């Protein structure tokens, strides 16, 4: 049946939604895939061992609804208590619960105009008023733009897709000016060059920090994310979770995430490799005439003064190299967001760009 003949059964909310568009997951082999910010090095061997250990009769049983062992490990890692940790199916689910539990108020929630594009989707889904605050000319967040009364603030740090980092001192200034509304720092990429805001949680009851194991822990396929905040904020998230899905993390996700959190040496080693490759990639791109924004993430955001971003992405694809291009907002249409892959993948990209530029 056509969409026209079936959409009459939709709710008004669904009809008005503009859903999030995920990055492409191509089925073709032998591609240089640099479009969705996955970690190129794979999870810790301990993760694979833990996953194998979950194969058995216990799969007939429901998993721990509260992920107690995983929450305890995350709490130990961040030097907080387990009741300050919430876990979910990727940070996207954690963020969705956060919007409903903590950011749905009469006043609008503020976030940057160039940022993670799921934020306005959540607002549309839950009927949350929002205001997109323009980044400055250097694509940076200006804290002074977030000081007016509001229903909350959320932004990634480093920001996505720009990769730019807001210093902790500026975050503290933002918190000082927003004592009566929740401030959410989305730290999906912070392990690649930023300082976490988690230590600020002890002094700021309105602060919630969300994180994911998809990027720095190379576990995008398991879907594990979490939030750290003072206990009342975590209780609010749990109330939403238990009204939606009381068993969000399956046995494999809990076991794999626990093993990854506990293997700190492996985690630190792959982050260091990504950071080193990023430095090489930035130098190579700049030598080809690209402007590359300063990045504290596992991707770079770059444009060439003589080449259209969309056309360049298409020509790279013809050479079996996939990067991410955003048509909107128009201000970032000249840019390409390029995941930092292995040295070999990035060398292949640079060689292709030498031929194209």
Curated annotation (Swiss-Prot):
What's the Enzyme Commission number for this chain? 2.6.1.9
Cite a single Pfam family from the UniProt record: Aminotran_1_2
Any one GO molecular-function label of the UniProt entry: histidinol-phosphate transaminase activity
GO biological process terms, alphabetically, are: L-histidine biosynthetic process
Sorted keywords for this record are:
Amino-acid biosynthesis, Aminotransferase, Histidine biosynthesis, Pyridoxal phosphate, Transferase
List residues, modification N6-(pyridoxal phosphate)lysine: 215
Cofactor(s) needed by this chain? pyridoxal 5'-phosphate
Gene3D superfamilies, per this entry? Answer: Aspartate Aminotransferase, domain 1, Type I PLP-dependent aspartate aminotransferase-like (Major domain)
Q: Which reaction does it catalyse?
A: L-histidinol phosphate + 2-oxoglutarate = 3-(imidazol-4-yl)-2-oxopropyl phosphate + L-glutamate
SUPFAM superfamilies named in the record: PLP-dependent transferases
Pathway in which this enzyme or protein is active: Amino-acid biosynthesis; L-histidine biosynthesis; L-histidine from 5-phospho-alpha-D-ribose 1-diphosphate: step 7/9
What NCBIfam families has UniProt attached to this entry? Answer: hisC (TIGR01141)
What is said about its interaction partners and assembly? Answer: Homodimer.
Q: Which PANTHER family match?
A: HISTIDINOL-PHOSPHATE AMINOTRANSFERASE, HISTIDINOL-PHOSPHATE AMINOTRANSFERASE-RELATED
Q: Tell me the protein family, please.
A: Belongs to the class-II pyridoxal-phosphate-dependent aminotransferase family. Histidinol-phosphate aminotransferase subfamily.
Name of protein = Histidinol-phosphate aminotransferase 2
Q: Which organism is it from?
A: Thiobacillus denitrificans (strain ATCC 25259 / T1)
Name the encoding gene, please: hisC2
């Amino acid at each position: 049946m056509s969409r026209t003949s079936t959409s009459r059964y939709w709710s008004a909310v669904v009809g008005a939604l503009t859903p999030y568009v995920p990055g492409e997951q191509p089925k073709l082999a032998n591609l240089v895939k640099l479009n969705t910010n996955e970690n190129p090095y794979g999870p810790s061997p301990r993760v694979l061992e833990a996953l194998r250990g979950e194969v058995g009769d216990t799969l007939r049983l429901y998993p721990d609804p509260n992920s107690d062992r995983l929450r305890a490990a995350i709490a130990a890692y961040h030097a907080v208590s387990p009741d300050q940790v919430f876990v979910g199916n990727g940070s996207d689910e954690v963020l969705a619960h956060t919007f409903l539990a903590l950011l749905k108020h009469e006043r609008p929630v503020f976030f940057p105009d160039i940022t993670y594009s799921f934020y306005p989707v959540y607002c549309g889904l839950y009927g949350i008023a929002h205001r997109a605050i323009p980044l400055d000319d250097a694509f940076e967040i200006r804290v002074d733009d977030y000081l007016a009364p509001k229903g909350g603030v959320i932004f990634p740090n480093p920001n996505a897709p720009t990769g730019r980092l807001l210093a902790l001192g500026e975050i503290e200034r933002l918190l000082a000016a927003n004592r009566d509304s929740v401030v959410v720092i989305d730290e999906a990429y912070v392990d690649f060059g930023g300082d976490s805001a988690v230590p600020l949680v002890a002094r700021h009851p309105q602060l919630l920090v969300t994180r994911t194991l998809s990027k720095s822990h190379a576990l995008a396929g398991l879907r594990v994310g979490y939030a750290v905040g003072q206990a009342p904020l975590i209780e609010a998230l749990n109330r939403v979770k238990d009204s939606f899905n009381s068993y969000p993390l399956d046995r494999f996700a809990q076991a794999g995430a626990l093993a990854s959190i506990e293997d700190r040496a492996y985690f630190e080693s792959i982050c260091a490799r990504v950071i080193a490759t990023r430095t090489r990639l930035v130098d190579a791109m700049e030598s080809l005439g690209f402007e590359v924004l300063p990045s504290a993430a596992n991707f770079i955001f770059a444009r060439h003064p003589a080449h259209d971003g969309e056309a360049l992405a298409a020509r790279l694809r013809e050479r079996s190299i996939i990067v991410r291009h955003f048509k909107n907002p128009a201000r970032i249409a000249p840019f390409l967001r390029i995941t930092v892959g292995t040295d070999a993948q990035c060398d292949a990209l640079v060689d292709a760009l030498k031929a194209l530029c």
